[in-house]
Amino acid sequence: MFFACYCALRTNVKKYRYQDEDGPHDHSLPRLTHEVRGPELVHVSEKNLSQIENVHGYVLQSHISPLKASPAPIIVNTDTLDTIPYVNGTEIEYEFEEITLERGNSGLGFSIAGGTDNPHIGDDPGIFITKIIPGGAAAEDGRLRVNDCILRVNEVDVSEVSHSKAVEALKEAGSIVRLYVRRRRPILETVVEIKLFKGPKGLGFSIAGGVGNQHIPGDNSIYVTKIIDGGAAQKDGRLQVGDRLLMVNNYSLEEVTHEEAVAILKNTSDVVYLKVGKPTTIYMTDPYGPPDITHSYSPPMENHLLSGNNGTLEYKTSLPPISPGRYSPIPKHMLVEDDYTRPPEPVYSTVNKLCDKPASPRHYSPVECDKSFLLSTPYPHYHLGLLPDSDMTSHSQHSTATRQPSVTLQRAISLEGEPRKVVLHKGSTGLGFNIVGGEDGEGIFVSFILAGGPADLSGELQRGDQILSVNGIDLRGASHEQAAAALKGAGQTVTIIAQYQPEDYARFEAKIHDLREQMMNHSMSSGSGSLRTNQKRSLYVRAMFDYDKSKDSGLPSQGLSFKYGDILHVINASDDEWWQARRVILDGDSEEMGVIPSKRRVERKERARLKTVKFNAKPGVIDSKGDIPGLGDDGYGTKTLRGQEDLILSYEPVTRQEINYTRPVIILGPMKDRINDDLISEFPDKFGSCVPHTTRPKRDYEVDGRDYHFVISREQMEKDIQEHKFIEAGQYNDNLYGTSVQSVRFVAERGKHCILDVSGNAIKRLQVAQLYPIAIFIKPKSLEPLMEMNKRLTEEQAKKTYDRAIKLEQEFGEYFTAIVQGDTLEDIYNQCKLVIEEQSGPFIWIPSKEKL
């Protein structure tokens, strides 16, 4: 990548970019501008016009109008504006609105998706609003909403046009833009007050939603998702699936988190007053309409938790023929576009002790009845129980992701105080969990679940479970050795009776922690043990790898987990194997102190691992998770720089420095261009771009110092490059282009983060120039998230993008400020914003010359 500046486009010019990390190559004319000026400009993405995704913009006012929850999009297609579509014979009501926007200094302030060439919702060719940019013209006006469908731009019909045609229409609409949009008519509500009396099965209903866990995209409300047989809600008969909970007793449920709603419901007395909103419009069998309030839930699966003779639980399942679900949040394929990604799957909570049937499926995808079904619980379930003071616990289970249509059923398992049967089949990793306990009759507890192991995949065990028996062998009073022997000799199929005991386990953990602290203090005071303290040494380091204390079996005392990029205050580095440390937080040192592996220990284990990999693995083999085989199995997620086998990344000595400039930002890896787009669009007052240099002659419409710094002498620019005055430079069509240190400094000293589109080599050059950038690497988890976030990528393109990212980490891993991972673009974007906020200064940690 030869150009560092991240800039917007003029309407008649394409942005120059050698290569987008997650899209096709663009070898168009190199033409960068400094900033967007005048109403004729629109901030667009980096791709060719035919590939442009977004129409971003903003106005200069600081007031941001609050965005209201938008109705969910619907799968319809209207041939004309006069035709009202029908879904399954039911009329769907729309409202139409003409919205006039005055284009701000940089555009209209919203993003779009869809078109005849890339439908956003099903087969609907419409152009849909996917994002309202805070502070932009659309947000200030307040009328345009996410999921609005644009039918006309001024006098141009865009109801059935390609994506690029819609973008072109918006770009050429002038400074005053009239949008004619269609949206689904809002659902009217009737507010009802319901008085419930808690019975032996609690309140007897399930909820979903809340701030940060939206059940319906754009809506933070708490919704009823299931009515439990025999519960108070079913006996009363008025509460229905799809009802919106407004108040519980005197507590409002508007704009609360899911956990807050659960806590409010849990802490109620025997008499509970609910205020609920009921939808007054019924959409019959429209799967995209609101809930059908005529039924508590869809026809149930024959899916029961049965009580065994000994009080344990047996699982039994049979499936009825598939029929469309009565209520469905937005299906996955409706949220597929580059700028907007779906929120995380919502958490569901059950307000009763034990569900006799699983929660109703959220939606069905079209499948043949003879296909196999995926039976899993992708969401944590909270069971609020039989007893008023029963504990609320969570349980989650992994579900297998598949790109093919599948049916997901929810399974409710009681984890509170009731013994339950768990059947596991040993795999190559054994049973996949660790145990602790067995002293003084305190019991045997599950302390760790190995990711991907049999226990993890079953979802039936969790940390804090007490193991009561194994294949009929009573372990309630067993020692640790007896329990380990019973599990080891249990054969391939192991039947476990487990009971969730979070309070007992917490007391046990506290006891162990105290014992470890005593051992630590004794070894330090006596000079014996595994920690030698002949010469106490203190320093600050930046972690260059991830460390999980729960996976390190060699710990002599309480460990301290950390992530790549964390700053650690090493209090005692005198021991060859183990150091004592605290994690440094914004306000100083963390209270938590623990043991971490020393630099020597990390490097020794990594070299041993590399020898094993070279012996066992084929050259260049990388597994589906992007890890070299064997990496991190013992908790050490260390890395070795490619081509530098002697340089193993462990810890980097750092020192704290005060800066008087705003740090440049370099984002590397897949999706970096979209993250850069959103940062500049959402925070135009905080992020900017610099003006590049070129030896190309100036064109008539260009302004020196705004579009480029035009260098008269090629010899002079070559001399400046040799003198390291440029962080990155290259040649295109016999002309030199590059970004100078001075251009970056100009932006940084004026209080803006300079967004730089550069290679990893520029990080070190900026550090040498005393402009320490915030360098964030976006590390893909696997191919699947890449293809989910960019639906246009083929598997081959995704593989190339993935491989480029792995090489990028191997080459420049030592220079990254942070590494972020996520399943959605929104998740990655939020993590990047958090890193930038935390690393902005004025006090930052920079590499020091101290030797470890």
Swiss-Prot record:
- Which intervals hold domain PDZ? 98-184, 193-279, 421-501
| CDD domains noted in UniProt | GMPK (cd00071), PDZ1_Dlg1-2-4-like (cd06723), PDZ2_Dlg1-2-4-like (cd06724), PDZ3_Dlg1-2-4-like (cd06795), SH3_DLG2 (cd12032)
Q: Which residues form the Guanylate kinase-like domain?
A: 662-837
Q: Which Pfam families match?
A: Guanylate_kin (PF00625), MAGUK_N_PEST (PF10608), PDZ (PF00595), PDZ_assoc (PF10600), SH3_1 (PF00018)
Q: Which tissues show it?
A: Detected in juxtaparanodal zones in the central nervous system and at nerve terminal plexuses of basket cells in the cerebellum (at protein level). Brain. High levels in cerebellar Purkinje cells. Expressed in pyramidal cells of the Ammons's horn and granular cells of the dentate gyrus in the hippocampus as well as cerebral cortex and striatum. High levels in dorsal horn of spinal cord.
Q: Modified residue Phosphotyrosine is at which positions? A: 58, 505, 732, 737
Cell location: Cell membrane; Postsynaptic density; Synapse; Cell projection, Axon
- What GO MF terms are annotated? ionotropic glutamate receptor binding; kinase binding; PDZ domain binding; protein kinase binding; protein phosphatase binding; protein-containing complex binding; structural constituent of postsynaptic density
Tell me what happens on changing residue 5 to S: Loss of palmitoylation and targeting to postsynaptic density
> What are the SH3 domain coordinates in residue numbering?
536-606
Instruction: Name the InterPro entries on file.
Output: DLG1-4_PDZ_assoc, DLG1-like, DLG1_PEST_dom, DLG2_SH3, GK/Ca_channel_bsu, Guanylate_kin-like_dom, Guanylate_kinase_CS, P-loop_NTPase
Q: Does the keyword Membrane apply?
A: yes
Q: Which GO terms describe its cellular component?
A: axon cytoplasm; axon initial segment; basolateral plasma membrane; cell junction; dendrite; glutamatergic synapse; juxtaparanode region of axon; membrane
Query: Which UniProt keywords are present, listed alphabetically?
Result: Cell membrane, Cell projection, Lipoprotein, Membrane, Palmitate, Phosphoprotein, Repeat, SH3 domain, Synapse
Role, per record: Required for perception of chronic pain through NMDA receptor signaling. Regulates surface expression of NMDA receptors in dorsal horn neurons of the spinal cord. Interacts with the cytoplasmic tail of NMDA receptor subunits as well as inward rectifying potassium channels. Involved in regulation of synaptic stability at cholinergic synapses. Part of the postsynaptic protein scaffold of excitatory synapses.
The protein's assembly and partners:
Interacts through its PDZ domains with NETO1. Interacts with NOS1/nNOS through second PDZ domain. Interacts with KCNJ2/Kir2.1 (via C-terminus) through one of its PDZ domains. Interacts with KCNJ4. Interacts with FRMPD4 (via C-terminus). Interacts with LRFN1. Interacts with LRFN2 and LRFN4. Interacts with FASLG. Interacts with ADAM22. Interacts with DGKI (via PDZ-binding motif).
The name on file for this protein is Disks large homolog 2
Q: What organism does the record attribute this protein to?
A: Rattus norvegicus (Rat)
Q: Where is the organism placed in the taxonomic lineage, from the top?
A: Eukaryota, Metazoa, Chordata, Craniata, Vertebrata
